[in-house]
């Protein structure tokens, strides 16, 4: 047996998971790192701290698993997407704080570019919308703020990358400046049809091509970890953004396969095969994976507030003492909030509405409304938002035949059943919780030649429990009608 080390670099912590060659977890290490909010709407990370915590958890996982680096088959990497790092090629040191995917500082720039008529080109080439969420305007902002940085970038002295590129550069001792197609597809700069950095979009944002990484297959070779870091040279063979890694880890490999990750927010993806299907309903078209030079695509929708709504009940309202109490409440109410609807538009609404001006509300309350109804309405809001995404996917011709789920919320059986009922779709929960890291490990195993093909991932996927829809169409229809009225109110000026 030769284990695989998956590095899972997230928004709030760096993690390392050691897998055996059959996909079972041998050891886990995790450490948080600091979040910085220097101005309203700004979110930054220290890229050097991200590197140091990643290296520390990699060493810790190996120690916990009793595995020496020379015995590893490969390293795989998965990462928070869109977060932007700019560093000096010669020293390997960041020249500015990393601008996190949540950062909104470039909202005005995006509006200006939209007014100039750039968005149709952005969508046509990248499958994305013109939004501060993506890397392109973040990188442009860094270069625009400092003429000296721009001059160094144009001279080829600086390197840009998303977190995967940054870690690869440091792990390989500066030998490799590369990313994979899934991460490149989130930059606002990469043409997902032709598989090249877009000259037109780079010009529109004044991005020097010299700073951009090489784009490789998701199961490609990304160099070797230098011996000084882990004790021996180890090949890096699998790289993917976190949501795409979870899609792969869930064995969603073909059209009709879909997954949704329920954490603080929610990310849903539906596999579209080799067709880059552009959404007519404000979903994102993104690269699901690139293998052997062939790109596979997915439609993606994101919900800003999922588990965060439950945290709000606990931390701000004090309605519950722990997230686990929601299961007890749902067991009592059977998912029926008695006509109460909560729209958790605390930061606007995500896909398919993309309405930054929407605001949270609760509607339908009476004197009979109590704690249980409020808690049920809050949890149900996650299922309703997912139904909005599913309907948009369906109208775009990408409705999944079933939905595989992961993330912190899915340990709650009552939520999973409510989700299946609301979606009118079978919902499957896997045995393995570490789906994102498992996807990176599977890509590494594939790249290293240990897996004969992607189908090995499907063969190793194990079901924990399936949830079948149990409500009648009339019940679901009535509930959805109430939800849509509530959303319309939340979006009213």
What are these regions (language model features)?
Residues 33, 79, 102, 219, ...:
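Residues that line or immediately flank small-molecule/substrate-binding pockets and catalytic motifs
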Residues 46, 103, 242:
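Short, conserved phosphate/pyrophosphate- and ester-handling motifs at nucleotide-, phospho-/glycolipid
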Residues 1-96, 124, 214, 230-235, ...:
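N-terminal glycine/serine-rich phosphate-binding loop of ATP-dependent small-molecule kinases
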Residues 205-220:
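A conserved helix-loop-beta module that forms one wall/lid of the active-site cleft
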Residues 5-7, 107, 113-177, 188-199, ...:
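Active-site core segments that coordinate phosphate-bearing ligands/cofactors
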Residues 63-101, 126-135, 168-191, 216, ...:
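Short beta-strand-loop/turn "lid" adjacent to the catalytic site in phosphate-handling enzymes
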């Amino acid at each position: 047996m030769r284990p695989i080390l998956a590095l899972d670099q997230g928004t709030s912590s760096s993690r390392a998971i050691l897998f055996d060659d059959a996909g079972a977890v041998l050891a886990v290490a995790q450490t948080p790192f600091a979040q910085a909010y220097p101005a309203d709407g700004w979110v930054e990370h220290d890229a050097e701290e991200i590197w140091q915590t990643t290296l520390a958890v990699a060493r810790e996982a190996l120690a916990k698993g009793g595995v020496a680096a020379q015995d590893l088959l490969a390293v795989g990497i998965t990462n928070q997407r869109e977060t932007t790092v700019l560093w000096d090629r010669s020293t390997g040191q960041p020249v500015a704080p990393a601008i996190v995917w949540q950062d909104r500082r470039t909202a005005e720039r995006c509006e200006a570019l939209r007014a100039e008529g750039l968005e149709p080109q952005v969508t046509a080439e990248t499958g994305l919308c013109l939004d501060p969420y993506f890397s392109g305007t973040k990188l442009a902002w860094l270069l625009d703020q400092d003429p000296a940085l721009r001059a160094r970038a144009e001279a080829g002295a600086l390197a840009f990358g998303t977190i995967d590129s940054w870690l690869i550069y440091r792990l390989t001792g500066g030998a490799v400046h590369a990313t994979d197609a899934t991460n490149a597809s989130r930059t606002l700069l990469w043409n997902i049809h032709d598989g090249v950095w877009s000259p037109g979009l780079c010009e529109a944002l004044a991005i020097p091509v010299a700073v951009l990484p090489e784009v490789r297959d998701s199961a490609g070779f990304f160099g070797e970890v230098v011996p000084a870091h882990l004790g021996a040279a180890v090949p890096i063979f699998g790289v993917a953004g976190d949501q795409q890694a979870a899609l792969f880890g869930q064995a969603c490999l073909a059209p009709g396969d879909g997954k949704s990750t329920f954490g603080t927010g929610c990310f849903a993806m539906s596999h579209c095969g080799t067709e880059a299907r552009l959404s007519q309903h404000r979903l994102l078209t993104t690269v699901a994976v690139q293998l052997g030079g062939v790109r596979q695509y997915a439609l993606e929708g994101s919900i800003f507030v999922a588990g965060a709504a439950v945290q709000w009940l606990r931390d701000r309202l004090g309605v519950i003492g722990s997230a686990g109490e929601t299961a007890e409440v749902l067991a009592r109410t059977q998912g029926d909030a008695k006509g109460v609807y909560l729209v958790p538009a605390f930061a606007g609404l995500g896909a398919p509405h993309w309405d930054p001006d929407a605001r949270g509300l609760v509607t339908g309350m009476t004197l009979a409304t109590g704690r249980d109804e409020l808690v049920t309405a809050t949890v149900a809001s996650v299922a309703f938002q997912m139904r909005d995404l599913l309907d948009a996917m369906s109208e775009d011709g990408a409705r999944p035949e079933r939905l595989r789920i992961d993330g912190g919320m899915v340990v709650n059986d009552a939520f999973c059943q409510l989700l299946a009922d609301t979606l009118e779709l079978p919902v499957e929960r896997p045995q393995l919780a570490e789906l994102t890291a498992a996807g990176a490990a599977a890509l590494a195993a594939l790249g290293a030649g240990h897996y004969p093909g992607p189908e090995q991932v499907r063969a190793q996927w194990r079901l924990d429990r399936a949830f079948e829809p149990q409500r009648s169409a009339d019940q679901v229809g009535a509930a959805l009608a109430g939800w849509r009225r509530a959303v319309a109110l939340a979006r009213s000026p």
